Amino acid sequence: MLEILNEIDAFVWGPPLLVLLVGTGILLTFRLKLLQVFKLPQALGLIFSAKNDGSGDVNSFKALCTALAATVGTGNIVGVATAIKAGGPGALFWMWMAAFFGMATKYSECLLAVKYRTVDANGNISGGPMYYIENGLGKKYKPLAVMFAVFGVLCAYFGIGTFAQVNSIVEITQISAGIPVVYTGIALTVVVAAVTIGGLKSIATVAAKVVPAMALLYFLTTVGIMIVFADQVPAAIATVLNSAFTPTAAQGGFLGATVMLAMRSGVARGVFSNESGLGSAPIVAAAAKTKWAAEQGLISMTGTFIDTIIICTLTGLYLVVSGVWCGPLNGAAMTESAFTMAFPAFGSILLLVGLVLFAFTTILGWNYYGERCVEYLMGVKAILPYRIGFIILVACGPFLKLEEIWVMSDIVNGLMALPNLIALVALSSVVVAETKAYQQHLKEESELVPAKLAEETNH
C-alpha cells in the first residue's frame, strides 16, 4: 500500500505541480512588485489595528487566528522533521523559498476570497476558491470550482484535517506521558465534537485565545534550544544552505538525499505547513469583517510568514543543531529527542503541550474548511452529516500508520492546490487592480489628515 501511495505522491508532486506552485508565487511576486517584502510591516501592523468596519462574520484578527489554527499544526513540528528526514537539511531552504513566494500567493487568494464572497438571505457569508473560480472566471468554470471543493473535503477528511493531526497527538502522548492510544483517541474525539458543533464563531473564539498562546510558548521553547546549542547554529545554517544545492550523503540513520528530493520534500511539506496556494485560508478570510479585500489579503499573508519563516525555521534549525536528523527516529519521536536533549527534565512535556495544541486547533480549522466545501457542493443540509463523518474519522485516526498518513496528505494537498493555482494565474490582473485601488485609497486618506488638521488650526 505504501509503495503505491509513494508512486502516486511522486507523480502528483512531480515537476509540473512544483513549477506551477512556485511559478504562481513568482508570477504574483513580480506582478505585485515584491509586495511581501515592502508591505510586510504594514501587514503586521494591520493584525491588531484593522478597523473591522465592513460586513463579515468575524473580525480580521479572529479570521487570521482561525486560519493560523488550521495552518500552525503538526506540519510545523512533525512535518519539518519528516521533510528533513526524507530530503536532508536542504529541505528547510526549499521550505523558505516556498514560503517567500507563497506569501504573495496567500495575499492574492485571500484578497480574491473577500472580493468574490457571497451573502445569503440570512446574512451568512460564504467564500473561498470555489466562489472566486465560479464568480470570477465565469459559470463555465464551475467544474473547476467543484473539483476544488471535492478535494477540499477529501483534504479535511483524509489529509491535513484529521489523520495527520490525530496520529501525531496520540504518538506524542504515548511517548511523553505513556497514555494509551485508545484513551487519547476517545478524549480527543469528545473535545473535537464539542467545539465543532458550535460552528465558525465557536472555532474562531477558541482559536483567538489558543493560537497566540501556543505560538508564543513554542517560540520561547525553541529559542531556548537554540541558546543551548548556540555554538552549533552557524554550522547548522551552513549545512542547510549547502544541502539545498548538493546531494546529502548517507550518515547514521539518514539514508541520503538528492537535490530534487530535498526540493520536493521542502516544497511539499512547506505547502502542508503554510497552506499557501492550497486554497484553504481564503475560505475563512472571506468571513472577515473588512471593507477592503486587499486589507484582508495583507493580514492573511502574515500567516505564511509566522508559520514558516519563523516557526518552521526554528523547528528545522533545532533538528539540525541537535543532530537528531542523522539518527534512526522520525516524526514526533525525532522532535521529542531534540527537546529532551536540550531540556532533559521537562523537554518532552513542553513538546507534548505544544504539539497537542497545534494539532487540536488544526483539526478545528480544517473541520470548518471542509464544512464550507460540503455546503458549496450539497447545500446547508449536508453540514450535519459532514460533521458526524468528520468526528468518526477523528476517532479512527489513532490507528493508522504514520508513513501512509503523511503520503496520503501530500497527495490530496496537491490535488486541492491545482484548481486554485489555475484560478490565481487567471485572476492575477484582478489582484493587481484591487491592490492598486487599496494603496491609492491609503495614500489619499493619509493626505487628508494633514489637510484636516490645517483647516482646524485656521479656524
What residues fall within each predicted segment?
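Alpha-helical membrane segments and immediately flanking helix-loop junctions
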Residues: G54-A86, L112-G136, M147-V150, L154, ...
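Transmembrane helix-loop junctions in multi-pass membrane proteins
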Residues: L17, R31-Q36, G75-V80, P89, ...
